[in-house]
Amino acid sequence: MNESVTELKDTTGNPAPLGLLGFGMTTVLLNLHNAGVYELNSMILAMGICYGGAAQIVAGIMEWRKGNTFATTAFLSYGLFWLSLVTLIVLAKLGWAAAPNDTAMAAYLAMWGLFTAVMFVGTLRLNVALQVVFGSLTILFFLLAIGDFIGAGPGFRHFTGYEGIFCGFSAIYAGLAQVLNEVYGKVVLPLGQVKQ
């Protein structure tokens, strides 16, 4: 009796750049607000829903399909973070729920900081670019939490915004580096591979 073996090959694209770009671009735009460049507006909320939220969720589901636990957890979690942040803002603006006070927001942001700090440990086995993204994001969440907890003034909030802009651009770099490196079949923008 002849037995045939069929081998299935994964031919789907790399979803990580989509997730990193969704996170990075939305983070830059929100932190331009935090840095005092412009007021909170519908552009930031729309980016939070669509690119920061939905695009990262799509990337997370695609990473799940590829069996990548780290990326699945990261993209789904941060996609849902963006949706929850927009929901917090919109519910209060519509008068459907009370806005969280500074202590509540500090707790919310600190929990995300703790989660991100643990995820940062995972990047120590991946690459330097992701270490920069997750390291700077950990700092950003804790700065935001501290700012809300102590009722920080504009100077502290603007400084935090600049740190967030750096974090967002580091994610944009990591995402675009993966795209260009794949397209050219060589290292165009280095990610700083970690020796295992």
Tell me what each language-model feature is.
Residues 69-78, 129-136:
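Cytoplasmic-side transmembrane-helix entry/capping segments in multi-pass membrane proteins
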Residues 7-14, 36-43, 65-69, 96-103, ...:
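Juxtamembrane loop-transmembrane helix junctions in multi-pass integral membrane proteins
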Residues 72, 80-107:
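Helix-adjacent hinge/juxtasegments
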Residues 185-196:
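Short, highly charged, low-complexity non-transmembrane loops/tails of multi-pass membrane proteins
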Residues 1-59, 63:
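N-terminal topogenic module of multi-pass integral membrane proteins
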